[in-house]
């Protein structure tokens, strides 16, 4: 009896030992951890993350770090055009001084007052100064803030509008779907760049302040940019709305808006994240193109495209490459970084991917 009992217990003990060994050597990974592991296995994804980390550190943490290391931004650094304070005095026919002597004719000599424009590279100006005596290195930092912030805000607004319109179109179908998709088709037929150029000219004619101009550009880019996301969301929801969990939601009486935004939209978040990441590079290119053509962010505000547009003169481009080459390099780094990260996320979130 004892031998038979030991024989019956042996397979169970062996199974427990195998299970313990599996638990020691193999860990169960959640879907998020699997995506993260796949993402960081890609060398291009790592390169993209490093590029974006350096870029964001330069743009957003650069000025505070410069101040912390003793780089002061004051009168000796701004080198702005000098001004003359206004002085007034009452004059009569014969103006005399305190001793009663008449003043003679005051001679004004027109002279050029120089500013520190096109200064060479130095400790106070790492990349020199531009035509107006502004430090190029500092303007690159603040220009990065403008370009990156504009890109993120536009992408977020495009995604929100695309989710709402695409979700309604895909879930309800019928006439609602037809109307929304025809609007999407019309927007897709309109070329983006000419519309932005026309809009910028109209904004110029309205004499809008420079500080408010960027918000108008964001609005215009958002209006003409949400159609692609809406089409993608619609296609995914058309597939998901026939699944069992949505049928169960209908049987349980869950409201329509909750089915769309609580149960359907979370299932397409991977595709949305990839779309947002890949879209950032295109938006930065659009903003840089408009600024290069003189229709983007105007002076005195800095943007990478604006800095390049200030050096369109062939003589300036040849003689002062520091005015436009660094800005062009940063634009290339930003676009490549977002594209590398977007490609890595797309491959990592694809269960059929071999990576």
Pin down the residues of each PLM region.
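Alpha-helical transmembrane segments of integral membrane proteins
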Residues: 129-355
């Amino acid at each position: 009896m004892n031998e038979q009992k030991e024989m019956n217990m042996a397979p169970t003990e062996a199974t427990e030992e195998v299970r313990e060994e599996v638990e020691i050597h193999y860990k169960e990974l959640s879907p998020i951890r699997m995506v993260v592991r796949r993402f960081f296995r890609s060398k291009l994804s790592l390169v993209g993350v490093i590029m974006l980390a350096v870029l964001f550190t330069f743009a957003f943490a650069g000025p505070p770090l410069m101040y912390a290391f003793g780089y002061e931004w004051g009168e000796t650094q701004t080198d702005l055009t000098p001004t003359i304070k206004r002085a007034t005095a009452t004059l009569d026919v014969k103006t005399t001084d305190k001793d009663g002597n008449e003043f003679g004719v005051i001679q004004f000599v027109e002279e050029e007052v120089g500013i520190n424009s096109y200064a060479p590279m130095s400790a106070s100006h790492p990349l020199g100064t531009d035509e107006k005596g502004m430090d190029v290195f500092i303007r690159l930092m603040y220009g990065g803030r403008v370009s990156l912030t504009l890109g993120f805000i536009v992408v977020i607004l495009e995604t929100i509008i695309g989710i709402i319109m695409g979700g309604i179109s895909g879930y309800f179908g019928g006439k609602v779907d037809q109307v929304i998709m025809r609007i999407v088709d019309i927007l897709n037929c309109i070329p983006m760049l000419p519309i932005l150029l026309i809009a910028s000219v109209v904004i110029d004619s309205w004499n809008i302040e420079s500080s408010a101009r960027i918000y108008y550009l964001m609005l215009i880019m958002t209006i003409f940019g949400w159609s692609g996301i809406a089409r993608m969301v619609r296609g995914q929801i058309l597939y998901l709305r026939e699944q069992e969990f949505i049928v169960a939601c209908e049987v349980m009486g869950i409201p329509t808006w909750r089915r769309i935004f609580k149960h359907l939209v979370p299932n397409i978040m991977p595709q949305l994240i990839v779309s947002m990441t890949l879209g950032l590079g295109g938006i930065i290119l659009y903003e840089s193109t408009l600024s290069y053509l003189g229709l983007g962010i105007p002076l005195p505000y800095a943007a990478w495209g604006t800095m390049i547009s200030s050096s369109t003169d062939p003589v300036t481009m040849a003689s002062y490459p520091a005015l436009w080459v660094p800005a062009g390099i940063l634009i290339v780094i930003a676009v490549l970084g977002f594209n590398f990260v977007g490609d890595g996320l797309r491959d990592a979130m694809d269960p059929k991917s071999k990576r």
